[in-house]
């Protein structure tokens, strides 16, 4: 046995030679689309012909400048397969301002692109590079957005029980709604166009009346009355309430038996989150708004979360999202990747969910999956019976389609 092992080791190329075989970063492109003005795609071209694809979300012009004015100087000419080294180099500049914002979104997109390129060159799906498959498919829950062919938010408002039954029969794990956003202080009028999140942003609310509490609760009660225990209900809070109102909401939710409440208060205080966990019996999911493992460490150290939510496109790419998921596992907690944004993030989430044993499920907006995702990608996500199937192509398993890139409303910028 040892003779055979030694023979293979001697026959294998040196590590430095294998690294060269993966190529170097030759060019970096960013792609923006006027029809989805909050998305940015990053394409990393390598010297061996691979084109890795990444993505991030929100104020893409700022992220684009970070990529071309900062990251390109650090990445061009560097080994494309040395992902950890490139991540560390980029993070050393990003964390100069507190490792968040446009810098971290740029790092996230580029990191995912490097993983995609590595999978293409090595001929394996990204989940294999992350440790291999723990499952063959992942169950999804649907976030109820009006998008594409589906008007799920309108449906949730008008008849939440009917929507819950429909999604249950389609195989989904559950549905996520945000019943109390409309009662929080508003930055702009609902329905206003502008940066993503405007309709769910605003000053933190310090008072929710009993009547408004009951009004929001009725959406979930009507759904639960219709579907009983056969389907999960999830609540999104968008961090709109102070800790006292968060406690009030969560206590009211206890009889409904939701799978979790997500970001009902700001996630920047581990002490507040600890109070929420101790004073209510509703599972708390924390938080797509936490950036990097260092922010998650404080929450977990305080035992202030039941489920860890990670956004691959914001928190540092696949590299950092896997670190956070592994950190959650040391506390025996499940994790769930966040995505209400774009198709590449959905793909990256899928690979991480396939590889990570403590994944509870993935988020999708079915109107996006059945809508514009199909226009952007050359290979659509396979969502059937409420589950996303294991990808079988190298890398992430999809690229931006040639027809999409040729559209007049698509803008490309190149650094090389």
Identify what each model region corresponds to.
Residues 125, 139, 232, 283, ...:
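Proline-centered loop/turn at the N-terminus of a beta-strand
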Residues 9-57, 367-374:
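Structured beta-strand/loop patches that form or line metal/cofactor-binding pockets in enzymes
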Residues 65, 85, 251, 257-260, ...:
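Shared catalytic-loop signature of beta/alpha-barrel
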Residues 3-4, 371, 377-416:
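C-terminal extensions of enzymes
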Residues 1-11:
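N-terminal export signals
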Residues 49, 71, 110, 123, ...:
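Conserved, mostly hydrophobic/aromatic
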């Amino acid at each position: 046995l040892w003779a055979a092992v030694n023979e293979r080791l001697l026959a294998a190329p040196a590590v430095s030679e294998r690294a060269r075989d993966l190529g170097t970063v030759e060019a970096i492109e960013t792609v923006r689309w006027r029809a989805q003005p909050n998305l940015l795609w990053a394409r990393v071209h390598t010297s061996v012909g691979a084109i890795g694809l990444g993505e991030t979300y929100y104020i893409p012009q700022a992220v684009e400048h970070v990529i071309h004015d900062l990251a390109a100087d650090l990445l061009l000419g560097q080994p494309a397969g040395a992902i950890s080294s490139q991540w560390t180099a980029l993070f050393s500049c990003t964390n100069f301002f507190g490792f968040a914002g446009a810098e971290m979104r740029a790092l996230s997109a580029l990191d995912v692109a490097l993983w995609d390129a590595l999978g293409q060159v090595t001929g394996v799906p990204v989940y294999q590079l992350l440790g291999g498959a723990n499952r063959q498919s992942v169950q999804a829950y649907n976030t109820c957005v009006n998008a594409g062919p589906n008007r799920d938010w309108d449906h949730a408002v008008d008849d939440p029980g009917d929507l819950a039954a429909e999604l249950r029969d389609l195989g989904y794990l559950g549905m996520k709604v945000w019943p109390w956003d409309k009662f929080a202080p508003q930055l702009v009028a609902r329905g206003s166009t502008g940066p993503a999140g405007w309709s769910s942003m605003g000053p933190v609310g310090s008072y929710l009346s009993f009547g408004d509490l009951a009004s929001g609760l009725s959406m979930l009660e009507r759904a639960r009355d219709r579907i009983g225990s056969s389907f999960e209900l999830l609540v999104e809070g968008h961090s709109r309430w102070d800790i006292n109102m968060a406690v009030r909401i969560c206590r009211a939710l206890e009889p409904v038996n939701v799978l979790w409440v997500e970001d009902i208060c700001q996630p920047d205080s581990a002490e507040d989150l600890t109070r929420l966990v101790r004073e209510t019996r509703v599972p708390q999911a924390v938080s797509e708004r936490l950036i990097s493992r260092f922010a998650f460490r404080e929450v977990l150290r305080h035992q202030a979360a039941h489920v860890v939510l990670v956004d691959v496109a914001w928190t540092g790419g696949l590299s950092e999202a896997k670190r956070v998921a592994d950190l959650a596992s040391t506390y025996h907690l499940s994790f769930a990747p966040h995505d209400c944004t774009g198709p590449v993030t959905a793909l990256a989430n899928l690979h991480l969910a396939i590889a990570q044993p403590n994944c509870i499920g993935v988020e999708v907006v079915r109107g996006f999956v059945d809508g514009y995702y199909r226009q952007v990608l050359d290979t659509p996500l396979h969502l059937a019976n409420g589950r996303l199937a294991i990808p079988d192509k190298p890398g992430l398993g999809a690229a931006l389609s040639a027809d999409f890139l040729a559209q007049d409303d698509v803008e490309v910028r190149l650094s090389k």
